[in-house]
A protein has these predicted regions:
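Active-site loop-helix segments enriched in His/Asp/Glu that coordinate
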Residues: 91-142
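Single, functionally critical "micro-switch" positions that shape active/binding sites
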Residues: 57-61, 89, 113
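N-terminal metal-binding scaffold of metallo-dependent hydrolase/deaminase domains
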Residues: 1-39
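Active-site gating loops and adjacent loop-to-helix segments of metal-dependent hydrolytic enzymes
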Residues: 66-99
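Conserved residues at the C-terminal ends of beta-strands
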Residues: 12, 69, 121
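Divalent metal-coordination and catalytic microenvironments
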Residues: 9, 25, 49, 60, ...
């Protein structure tokens, strides 16, 4: 049995009556004519012919730095050099818990806006690899 069935959707190429089957949080099928009569699901949504598009993808993100505006202070010049200096000031103050919390918050916000794939970069210049461990924990939870 499916967790979710979205039916009666329209694809960007104009195809109509499209159904999307979701099981265990993953899309398992996208096909024409997939309806509640043909597939049982715990929850069904009628798209009423509305447009169904692929999710947004962020191919370049620094999740270890997300939601850190103002930490330890605002980048007054807005320059890359000051940003790098600020990151150097912030790194000794970072905790794994704070990194995980901010990254998970960002992931929730991203999904709510239709962003379902994020390719992140991470600071590996810290001998502790704190940010790497934090983002591996985020990956495990998400």
């Amino acid at each position: 049995m499916l967790d979710l069935l979205i039916h009666n959707a329209t694809l960007p190429d104009g195809r109509t009556d499209i159904g999307v089957a979701v099981r265990d949080g993953k899309i398992v099928e996208v096909t024409a004519g997939l309806t509640p009569a043909k597939a049982q699901a715990h929850e069904t949504l009628d798209a009423e012919g509305q447009l169904l598009t692929p999710p947004f993808v962020d191919a370049h993100f620094h999740m270890d730095a997300t939601l850190s505006y103002g930490l330890p202070r605002v980048n007054a010049s807005g320059t890359l050099l000051e940003g790098i200096a600020l990151w150097g000031e912030l790194k000794p103050l970072l905790t794994q818990e704070a990194l995980v919390e901010r990254a998970l918050t960002y992931c929730d916000w991203a999904v709510a806006k239709g962003l379902l794939a994020i390719r992140t970069h991470v600071d590996v210049c810290d001998a502790r690899l704190l940010a790497v461990d934090a983002l591996l924990e985020v990956k495990r939870r998400v």
